[in-house]
Amino acid sequence: MSILSNIPGKKFIILAHCLLNQNTVVKPLASHVGVVSSLIQFITEKGYGVIQLPCPETIYLGLRRWWMSREQYDTVSYREFSKRILEPYIRLVEELVRDGCEYIVIGVKGSPSCAVRVTTSNQCWSGEPRVDKCPPPVKISSPGVFMEVLLEMIRRKGLKEPLELLEIDHDEVAAKGLPDDVCRVLEKYSPIK
């Protein structure tokens, strides 16, 4: 039995890596210096624990990678790589859930890897990114490949599903602050009332 098992409402957030480390965002798409501080401040004030996922794109391709679409990451080798680096995180989630914790997943809107609802798609992109030769990318209703693998692993383990799947748009937060819908959900499930 956990020492903290008498604390009501234990909750944590599984967080896309770049929300706590903007240095890993594809250049020049980072929107904050260091961290998305308004989000981090909000979730810590509301009493959530945080599991920061690794940045799959940086580990897989490094910091000098091009911007890419979901289709470019949707390969057998990237999915296997994602499973391999997620395995210890799934074990951690399993332990926390077994101890009575509930959780929320926060991804990055538009990310080909870390979106949970809306990702970037471009069937034409391959090879050198020549925007003049292809139509512009579009946003589609689909998780990014890495988050899709995460959610599949959670289901395969038979773990309790996340309370919510939320997305943060870096640029929107930089321009307007945290979206009201994200704040409402985090308030709703906050361990601190």
Predicted regions and their residues:
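A glycine- and small-aliphatic-rich helix-loop capping segment at beta-alpha/alpha-beta transitions
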Residues: 120-130
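Short, well-ordered beta-to-alpha junction loops that form the rim of enzyme active sites
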Residues: 108-112, 170
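Short glycine-rich phosphate-binding loop at a beta-alpha junction
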Residues: 102-108
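Short, surface-exposed acidic-centric catalytic microdomains
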Residues: 29-73
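Divalent-metal-activated hydrolytic enzyme cores
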Residues: 63-70, 75-91, 97, 128-193
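Short, solvent-exposed loop/turn segments at secondary-structure junctions
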Residues: 20-21, 57-58, 112-113
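A short acidic (Asp/Glu
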Residues: 25, 62-63, 114-119, 178
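Active-site and ligand/interface coordination hotspots across diverse enzymes
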Residues: 1-29
